[in-house]
C-alpha cells in the first residue's frame, strides 16, 4: 500500500471517530416508561430516548422476582408482583445499553435482556463507518513485499521457540507427566461437572456444570486458547483420555504394547469433518436447554465421554477427536489463526527417515493419535498438539514454532468443502446466537427454549435453513461474482468457493469473540460462587459463596465487541485480496475480492447492529 | 513403573474418591456435629407447579430447636411461619437459606412462601406439626371470628345503598368541628357496620341535617380514621404490600399482575377478579367484619387465598384498617 493511500485511510478512520455529529440537538424531555418484566423478557424490550432526556423508569414484574441492571449506569432495580420499583436518570451518553435481569428468575435468567437506545447512536454509526473505511483500506492492502512469483512473502520464517536442543521448554514438553497431570486434573473437573449437573441444583447459574462449562471453559477456549494457542485445549482435553489410556494400557508411560483396540479403520468416506458439522448443528439446535439446564449439560458431557471411550476400543487412535468431536471441528478450523504451530524443522529429514517413529511410535512416544504424519503437516487443523511426535522423534526434528497470526490462511492448498461448511456454520451460528441469546427478543428465546413445540420447530427450521442454505447460498453467490469470467469452467466455482472460504475463519472467530465477550464479561462472576458451592447445596468452600453477580466492564462491552468485529473484518478483507491474487495467478485483482469483501462487510454490519445498533 | 503406579493411584482417587466424597458430603458426613437439642431439617422450596415445599409436612417434638435448611429450586421464594412473629427469610434459587425456630407450644403451624413465585404462589404452604411431651398433637378450637359470631354471610353481595361520589376526607370531616355520635366513636362497634350504614345513620340524625351529603361522608371518613392508629395503618400497609398487592394492585384497584389469570367472566356474564377497593359502590357496602372474614377464610373458587392460619387476629384487623384508605382520604 502506498504511503499516500495509507494516510488517506488513516485520516478517514480518524474522521469517523472524531468528527462531531452534525445532527441538530433536540430539547431534552422527560419520559416516564413502565417496563414490565416476565419470564424471560422485558416489555417494552427497547426503550428509545434522546441524549440528555430524563428517564423515569417504573419497573414492575408480572410473574416472579426480577431485576433490572442497566449497563453503563449504576442502576439496579428489583421488582415483584405487587412491589414495583422506580428510578430516575439522565441519559447522558449516546449509544445502546443493555439491561439485564439481576435476580435469578429461572433457567433463561442469564439471557433475560432488554436495551436502552439513546439517540443519536453515534457509537454505532461511527463503528459502522469505521468498518467501511477499514474494509476499503484492507481491500487495497496488497500484502506488502511480494516474491517474484507474486505470492505473499512472510515477514519472517517461522521461528522455533526452542532456541537450542536443550531448551527448557523442549525438555518440559518431552516429559510425559506434566501433560498427564493437567489432563487428570481437568478430568476431575469434568467429573465434578457431571456430578453437579446430575445431582446439584437445577438452577443453571448456580451450578458448577453450567458455569464452568459454558462460561469459564467456553470463554477460555474461544477468547484465549484457540486464537493464541490453537488446539492447545485438545492436548489436555479429558474426554478422550480414558479411551486413550485403555488403548495404551498405560496412563503416563509408553507401554510399548500394541494398542488395545479392535483396530478397525475409520471408513474412508467419513475421514472429514462432515460428521462434526452435523454434530455441532444438532447440539446448536438445542443450545438454550443445553446452556441453561445442568442435567442436559451433564448428559451431553457423559455421552461424549462414552462415545470417545467406546470408539477408541473399536477404532484405532483418536477417531473421536479427529472426526466426531463437535468442538474439535471448529477448534481445528480456527487453530489456523493461532501464532503457534507444531511442525518439523526440515521435511527432508522426515522424508528420508524410514522408521517414521512419529507415526508408528517408539519407546519414547506413541505414534500420532491424530493420524498425522508430522513431516507433511502444513496446517494446524489436524494436529492436536499432544507432542507425542516431539517425544518420539529420534532426530529432534519436531519443533514448536512461533509465527504470524493466521499464517495457515495464506496458503492455498489443503482446504476442503467440509471445512468451508464448518466456516459457514460457525459464522452463521455466531450471528444467530448474538441475536437469540444476547438480543432483546424474548419470543425468540422462548421459541428456542421450548424444544419440540411448534414454535421451536419453526425456530429450528429457520436455524437450519440459514445455516445450511441461506448463508452458504449468499456466500456462494459472492464467490460466483468474483469468478464471473470463468463461470463456464467446470469445477472452478467449487475450487474458488473452498478457497475464498478461508475469509470465514477470521470473520467467524471475530464474531465468536464478540459474542463470547458479551457472555463471559457479564456472567463470569458466577464462577466464584459456583466454585464455592458447586452443587448449590449451601457449601462455602473458599468463603466465596456469597460473591454477588457482578457484570464486568459493562460500559465497555459494545466497544470491545466492535473492535473485535472490525479487526476480524480487516483480516478477512485483507485475506480476500490475497486469495483474489492467488486466483488471478499473482496479478492484482481487487475486483475479484470485492464481492466476498462485501459479504464480509455485510456480516460485520449485521453483527455491529446486533451488539450496538439502534 | 513407579510413575505409572503413582498415576494409577491418583486416577483411582479421582474416579472413585471424588464421587464418594461428594456422596459423603451430601450424606452429611463432613457436617459439624449437631448442637444438642437442635434438629436440622432440609426443605426444598419450589413453586407449586414444581412440587411446592418438599416435604410439605414436618413433624417434630416440642422443645427441639429447629434449624431449617431451605434450598431454592427455581425462582426467589421466602419462608415464614404463620402467626409467629419472626422475620421471613429470602430463599434464593440455587442457594440454601437457614431459618431457626423453636416452637413455643405444641400444635400445627403453617409455613408459607412470602414472595410471589407463581400464579399459584399462595398454595405454597406446608404444615409443621409440633408434638407435645405426651406425644399428642393438640387441635385447639379457636374463638370463632367476628363474622361467624355475627352470623354474616361473607359471600353475599354487599352493594352499598349509599356511597360517596367523591373521595371522603377525614381532614375535612375534622374541620367541621362536630362531635361524632357515641356509637360511631367506638372502634369495636364500627367494625360491625358498613360505611353505607354509617352514612344512613348520620343522614337520619337531625343533629347533622344541615350538612350536605359530601360533608356527611367526610364525617364517616373521620369516624373510620379515628377507629385506627397510624401504627396499625403502617402495619396493615406492610401486610397488604407483601401479601395482597400482587393481585389487588399497589393502588388497590384490583389490577395487580398476579390477578390477571384470575380475571374471568362467569356464566351469568358477571366479570370476576380481584376486588377493586377503590370502587366505592361495593367497598362502602361491607363492614370490617365482612372484610376480615374474607381475609381469614378466602373466597372459595375466586382465587382469593385464606389467610387464617397465617395472619394473627391483630394483623387481619390491621390489613382491613388499611383497606379503608382506598375508600377514604385519611
What is the role of each PLM region?
Chain B
Residues 163-166, 180-216, 246, 262-290, ...:
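Electron-transfer interface patches adjacent to heme c in soluble/periplasmic c-type cytochromes
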Residues 117-118, 175-185, 203-207, 247-253, ...:
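Detector for the c-type heme attachment site
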Residues 61, 106, 162-182, 231-254, ...:
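Sequence/structural segment immediately N-terminal to covalent heme-attachment motifs in c-type
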Residues 8-10, 15-37, 92-165:
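Extracellular/periplasmic metallocenter environments
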Residues 207-232, 289-299, 308-330:
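C-terminal capping alpha-helices of c-type cytochrome domains
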Residues 55-58, 86-90, 99-101:
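Beta-strand-rich interaction surfaces with strong enrichment in secreted/lumenal proteins
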Residues 35-65:
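N-terminal edge beta-strand
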Residues 136-178, 213-239:
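Electrostatic cytochrome c docking/interface patches
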